[in-house]
Amino acid sequence: MITANSFERTIGGRKLVIESGKLARLADAAITIRYADTELLVTLCSAKKPREGVDFLPLTIDYEERMYAAGKIPGGFIRREGRPSEQAILAGRLTDRPLRPLLPKEWRNDLQIIITVIASDKENDADIWGVVGASTVLAMSEIPYEGPVGASRIGYINGEFVLNPTFAQLESSQLDLVVVSTRKAVVMIEAGSKEIPEDIMINAIEFAHKANQELIDLQDEIRAKLGKEKLPVPVLEIPEEVKTAVAAFVKGRVNEALSHQDKTARENAVEGLQAELVAALSETFAEGDILAAYDKEIKKAIRSTILEKDIRVNGRGIKQLRQLDAETGLLPRVHGSALFTRGDTQVMAITTLGSLQESQQLDGLSAEDTKRFMLHYNFAPFSTGEVKRSGSPGRREIGHGALAERALVPILPTPEEFPYTIRLVADVVGSSGSTSMGSVCSSSLSLMDAGVPVKKAVAGISIGLITGENGTYCTITDIEGIEDNYGDMDFKVAGTRDGITAIQVDMKVKGISFDIIRDAIYQAKEARYNILDVMDKALAQPKTELSPYAPRMYKINIDPSKIGSVIGSGGKTIRSIIEQTNTTVDIENDGTVVIGAIDEASAKKAIKIIEDLTKDIEAGSIYTGKVTRIMTFGAFVEILPGKEGMVHISELADHRVEKVEDIVKVGDDITVKVIEIDNQGRVNLSHRVILNPNAVPISRNRDSQPRRPGPFRPSDRSNS
């Protein structure tokens, strides 16, 4: 038996075990991390040589879900795992975002961390343990790394913070917060919440940071025992003579180029100055060094202007929003639409409503199997005026869509209140920073325009950070793309007037203090209110009527014991209803039936069929049915879908009838009255009493009547 190094802690009342040396022994570093009965294999491999021609850290983090982990066989024709699920992509991003700032920017060797979920107890989310596992293998490896980090999930239930809540606990929690931090500072925050007040959110982040310390202690213990000696950090210095020459050439001109309020004009000015610079110095110095030095001059100009003068590149104040505009009812025929504009950033959001049958089917390790609300974010290359490949969404698009979706979930009506599947598409048509928060604003308005009875409007804002020497810093409201590129933080906050619904924080520095967190959260609140004022002018309340092109949903309730009558054998009956009426029919186990139709007449037709299928036949009731069979002694009539009774030959007319065929034929419609239901459930009908209301029906001894093929009991043929 292979022996492994094992390390244990009790975290949140459950056992955490990290083992190394048993699996993936040829990887540069590998561990298994197990929390309760959820287990992951985390590996790290590094290329031996730097990759040529790259000017960034080539880090790849893949998060892979094995369906066997939850005892499931993958769906699809080939029955094996294919492209990662949306949840797996988001979990990979959750790991990448906090670790990247802690690795040397100068590192050029390919790094690949693969996180594989190999066991899932369906109670504990594996995503945060992917972060802890990835941090552990980096700490053990020879890669320079300024970690380790801890990662904790925090819930807020009945006024108490809960460390690493289970899936079941999260359903009743007002908060789903993930915080990743080092020993001293927070490096990543991600949250979805039900309008949590700012002070509670800050306290929750502090609670998580304290909980992370035990995970950092554990990794330090592992590193002390198993860690390799770290490699030196590569040095990529720009020669001093290049920096001096570039600074002298652009002196005073960089600030002038950056001062244009219009993004296109600013970019043209910056690129024009760059072209002059390269033309003047390229015979003396390497072009790569010139461009790197010029980039540093731009960064220095942007940051120093903010720190020293409280003025930004385009002349805005540090808390000043860009020009805002909101518009609804943008497109014809669609169910709901809105356009939100913030400076040069524009997002068009379109709402489409469908039946609950159109919910997304999830095939992953998630506890959920369907999803009725979807927000899909698209970022076209024309939004930045560039020529790029246009194709399926990447990790960034999926992440931005998930953030906007999370921000809107708390204000949506329940399926009981609004039995629709809701799909939002946020198309970025212009980008100069903060498109994800623009997507929140436009999507909130689009839902209202579609008539979705949302509880409140939601707005989003991004707060940036510029740090200086000796701990000085400045938080800036509504960052543009250039401020995001050269700044230290992107602190996104979405919410209503009553609280926060989502947070996502990414940074380029190695962590932020709680003073910065506090400033950013309250600065975002002030900006959010201003944005909501503009949105309210466009549309303050959801429309009271749905679009005429949206499907209509009608809800009825039936006896749960009659569900089988509606579904039928192998779904035959319900398929027939859908085909006959051109509707959709969803049935819940409690007997709730939701009918979706493009018009009221189709819905009423479907409702009538369902009510007839579940209705009990009562003596004395009158029905118009169809003759299904002719016997010598009478005719069988279907009076409700799948339910028959018999009209004896003597009850077909108010005179003597020699042959049944003289009065009716198969397929004829006939109005009859139920005159008797015997103790075996067989139904006797009369047409004679319809013709002559004063006629007295003849009571018969049904035991003397022949057995089927002619019994008169009500039947649900679809169940036979």
Swiss-Prot record:
* Residues bound to Mg(2+): D484, D490
Q: Which residues form the KH domain?
A: 551-610
Task: Report the HAMAP family cross-referenced here.
Answer: PNPase
Instruction: Report the subcellular localization.
Output: Cytoplasm
Kindly list the biological process annotations in GO that this record carries.
Answer: mRNA catabolic process; RNA processing
The terms under GO molecular function for this entry are:
3'-5'-RNA exonuclease activity; magnesium ion binding; polyribonucleotide nucleotidyltransferase activity; RNA binding
Q: Recite the UniProt keywords alphabetically.
A: Cytoplasm, Magnesium, Metal-binding, Nucleotidyltransferase, RNA-binding, Transferase
Recorded GO cellular component terms are:
cytosol
This chain belongs to which protein, by name?
Answer: Polyribonucleotide nucleotidyltransferase
The segments labelled Disordered in the record are: 697-720
| SMART domains (alphabetical) | KH, S1
Does the record carry Metal-binding as a key word?
yes
Pinpoint the S1 motif domain residues.
Answer: 620-688
Q: Does the keyword Transcription apply?
A: no
InterPro entries noted in UniProt: ExoRNase_PH_dom1, ExoRNase_PH_dom2, ExoRNase_PH_dom2_sf, KH_dom, KH_dom_type_1, KH_dom_type_1_sf, NA-bd_OB-fold, PNPase
Please name one Pfam family that this protein belongs to. S1
> Its Enzyme Commission number?
2.7.7.8
Q: Which cofactor does it need?
A: Mg(2+)
Family as reported in the entry's similarity comment: Belongs to the polyribonucleotide nucleotidyltransferase family.
Task: Give a short account of what the protein does.
Answer: Involved in mRNA degradation. Catalyzes the phosphorolysis of single-stranded polyribonucleotides processively in the 3'- to 5'-direction.
Q: Which top EC class applies here?
A: transferase
